[in-house]
């Protein structure tokens, strides 16, 4: 356990934007070779999410002699941006690497961990529902799957994991389709947060936002202001910056001001003018890619037949490892087992490992 050490998200600590807030190139960062980060040791967690431009910006802002420790799992999904930085650094063979393989919890304590390791090794997972935290519901109909999802969120899982409905996350491989994010979100919105008199709504493009909705910020915005207030409206803290993947609840839609107020973790409230609503999406269900780097008390994973190029081992492994207390997979057992065997994840043509080796020759 390490205490008294500063921790901070890279976009907050490193990517302090000057000028254009949409510019995430090195030229838009205040931290660089002329204004480096002041640290003796830098530890980067969830390193598999870091792409080439971000890694370049980080290294450009580090002074010689600084120790850098990268922590990550190459078996999870690669970064959204270009490159496979962590994988290439490891495969270069030029840096000391420690691989953690031992499960320190008792084997019977968490089948989430045991099954995640089986998936990672390509071994079949026993789906007999004798587990206390890993469940499989065999279904072959999309409407039945969604009905089960609603029941789990409204009645079963909140008590089972001692969490609110908002803490239960549906993770799906796709945005489109009968079990895609867009369709599931519209259905769950009507069941989990139905309209009623006095509950304000706002239509924006293809989206309908309603007070009480669970939403996600889908791009970095370094200029948006947030504040924390008391119940009497006194401001106790404030700052700027809302980041891709942040999740919150719509607390108020003010039709007079034309704003939508979202409350994020730590009671941070952000007031969005209507013209920034394209930065928000409903988040009852999100893609597995969007969930990378996050954890939830319970996750629900709907799985039926889909494109083989989207249904691969790393995706399933990432989804399962998002849960702290409970995983429920609903759908086809054959699709689940086939995903474990499908290692045909789209390969990225990178040359970082070779260039590192050449530099060290």
How would you describe each model-predicted region?
Residues 39, 64-67, 93-98, 131-133, ...:
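Short glycine-/polar-rich loops that comprise or flank the Walker A/P-loop
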